[in-house]
Protein backbone atom coordinates (compact mmCIF):
# COMPACT_ATOMS: atom_id res chain seq x y z
CA UNK A 1 0.00 0.00 0.00
CA UNK A 2 3.03 2.31 -0.06
CA UNK A 3 2.42 4.93 -2.71
CA UNK A 4 5.09 7.18 -4.24
CA UNK A 5 4.58 10.94 -3.76
CA UNK A 6 2.30 12.48 -6.38
CA UNK A 7 0.60 9.19 -7.21
CA UNK A 8 -2.97 8.60 -6.09
CA UNK A 9 -3.27 5.62 -3.78
CA UNK A 10 -5.40 2.75 -4.98
CA UNK A 11 -8.32 2.01 -2.67
CA UNK A 12 -7.59 -0.69 -0.13
CA UNK A 13 -8.98 -4.15 -0.86
CA UNK A 14 -10.95 -5.54 2.08
CA UNK A 15 -12.06 -9.17 2.13
CA UNK A 16 -15.24 -9.90 4.12
CA UNK A 17 -15.57 -13.56 5.14
CA UNK A 18 -18.86 -14.82 6.55
CA UNK A 19 -21.19 -17.67 5.68
CA UNK A 20 -24.27 -15.50 6.39
CA UNK A 21 -25.29 -13.22 3.53
CA UNK A 22 -26.93 -10.69 5.86
CA UNK A 23 -23.66 -10.18 7.77
CA UNK A 24 -21.68 -9.71 4.55
CA UNK A 25 -24.22 -7.19 3.25
CA UNK A 26 -24.22 -5.27 6.53
CA UNK A 27 -20.43 -4.95 6.43
CA UNK A 28 -20.56 -3.84 2.80
CA UNK A 29 -23.07 -1.11 3.67
CA UNK A 30 -20.88 0.03 6.56
CA UNK A 31 -17.63 0.10 4.55
CA UNK A 32 -18.75 1.23 1.06
CA UNK A 33 -18.86 4.95 1.95
CA UNK A 34 -15.12 4.84 2.71
CA UNK A 35 -14.29 3.78 -0.85
CA UNK A 36 -12.74 0.37 -0.23
CA UNK A 37 -12.76 -2.33 -2.87
CA UNK A 38 -14.86 -4.96 -1.13
CA UNK A 39 -14.39 -8.66 -1.79
CA UNK A 40 -16.57 -11.32 -0.19
CA UNK A 41 -16.24 -14.99 0.64
CA UNK A 42 -18.88 -17.33 2.03
CA UNK A 43 -16.50 -19.83 3.65
CA UNK A 44 -13.00 -20.21 4.99
CA UNK A 45 -12.02 -22.29 1.99
CA UNK A 46 -13.30 -19.67 -0.46
CA UNK A 47 -11.50 -16.96 1.51
CA UNK A 48 -8.16 -18.75 1.09
CA UNK A 49 -8.78 -19.04 -2.67
CA UNK A 50 -9.58 -15.31 -2.96
CA UNK A 51 -6.54 -14.38 -0.87
CA UNK A 52 -4.30 -16.46 -3.16
CA UNK A 53 -5.71 -14.74 -6.27
CA UNK A 54 -6.25 -11.14 -5.13
CA UNK A 55 -4.10 -10.59 -2.01
CA UNK A 56 -6.38 -8.21 -0.07
CA UNK A 57 -5.00 -5.49 2.20
CA UNK A 58 -7.22 -6.49 5.15
CA UNK A 59 -9.47 -9.41 6.06
CA UNK A 60 -12.65 -9.15 8.14
CA UNK A 61 -13.19 -12.68 9.36
CA UNK A 62 -16.14 -14.11 11.24
CA UNK A 63 -15.19 -16.92 13.61
CA UNK A 64 -18.24 -19.17 13.55
CA UNK A 65 -18.52 -20.74 10.10
CA UNK A 66 -19.17 -24.32 9.02
CA UNK A 67 -16.19 -26.23 7.69
CA UNK A 68 -13.06 -24.18 8.20
CA UNK A 69 -13.76 -21.67 10.99
CA UNK A 70 -12.19 -18.25 11.41
CA UNK A 71 -9.51 -19.53 13.77
CA UNK A 72 -8.36 -22.08 11.21
CA UNK A 73 -8.38 -19.52 8.39
CA UNK A 74 -6.32 -17.04 10.44
CA UNK A 75 -3.81 -19.73 11.39
CA UNK A 76 -3.40 -20.76 7.73
CA UNK A 77 -2.93 -17.16 6.61
CA UNK A 78 -0.41 -16.37 9.33
CA UNK A 79 1.48 -19.60 8.67
CA UNK A 80 2.11 -18.66 5.02
CA UNK A 81 4.94 -16.22 4.20
CA UNK A 82 2.94 -14.83 1.27
CA UNK A 83 -0.05 -13.85 3.44
CA UNK A 84 1.18 -13.44 7.01
CA UNK A 85 1.44 -9.64 6.57
CA UNK A 86 -2.30 -9.23 5.88
CA UNK A 87 -4.05 -7.96 9.01
CA UNK A 88 -7.01 -10.00 10.24
CA UNK A 89 -9.88 -8.40 12.13
CA UNK A 90 -12.03 -11.10 13.71
CA UNK A 91 -15.74 -10.42 14.06
CA UNK A 92 -17.81 -12.46 16.47
CA UNK A 93 -20.74 -12.64 18.79
CA UNK A 94 -18.47 -14.50 21.23
CA UNK A 95 -17.46 -11.96 23.86
CA UNK A 96 -15.50 -14.21 26.19
CA UNK A 97 -11.81 -14.08 27.00
CA UNK A 98 -11.04 -17.61 25.73
CA UNK A 99 -12.42 -16.86 22.26
CA UNK A 100 -10.33 -13.70 22.00
CA UNK A 101 -7.17 -15.42 23.24
CA UNK A 102 -7.74 -18.27 20.76
CA UNK A 103 -8.13 -15.75 17.93
CA UNK A 104 -5.04 -13.79 18.89
CA UNK A 105 -3.03 -17.00 19.10
CA UNK A 106 -4.30 -17.92 15.64
CA UNK A 107 -2.89 -14.62 14.38
CA UNK A 108 -5.71 -12.06 14.43
CA UNK A 109 -4.57 -8.49 15.02
CA UNK A 110 -7.88 -7.30 16.46
CA UNK A 111 -11.40 -8.30 17.52
CA UNK A 112 -14.82 -6.67 17.32
CA UNK A 113 -17.93 -8.16 18.86
CA UNK A 114 -21.52 -7.92 17.66
CA UNK A 115 -23.52 -5.85 17.51
CA UNK A 116 -21.09 -3.93 15.34
CA UNK A 117 -20.86 -0.17 15.56
CA UNK A 118 -20.05 1.50 12.22
CA UNK A 119 -17.80 4.18 13.72
CA UNK A 120 -15.77 1.64 15.69
CA UNK A 121 -15.53 -0.75 12.73
CA UNK A 122 -14.36 1.98 10.35
CA UNK A 123 -11.84 3.34 12.86
CA UNK A 124 -10.40 -0.14 13.44
CA UNK A 125 -10.19 -0.84 9.69
CA UNK A 126 -8.36 2.45 9.08
CA UNK A 127 -6.00 1.77 11.99
CA UNK A 128 -5.07 -1.70 10.73
CA UNK A 129 -4.56 -0.43 7.18
CA UNK A 130 -2.30 2.37 8.46
CA UNK A 131 -0.20 -0.14 10.37
CA UNK A 132 0.61 -2.09 7.21
CA UNK A 133 1.01 0.92 4.91
Q: At which residue positions do the language-model features occur?
A:
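Short hydrophobic/Thr-rich beta-strand motif most characteristic of the beta2 strand and flanking loop
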Residues: 35-42, 50
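Active-site beta3 strand of CheY-like receiver
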Residues: 54-60
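Receiver (REC) domain active-site loop signature in two-component systems and cognate sites
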Residues: 65
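Charged docking surfaces used in two-component/phosphorelay signaling
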Residues: 25-33
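Active-site residues of response regulator receiver
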Residues: 18, 62, 92
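C-terminal output helix
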Residues: 116-125
Amino acid sequence: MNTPPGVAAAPARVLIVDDERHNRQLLEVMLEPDGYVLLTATSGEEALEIVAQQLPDLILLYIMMPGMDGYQVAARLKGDLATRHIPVLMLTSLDDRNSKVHGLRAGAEAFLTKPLNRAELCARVKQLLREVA
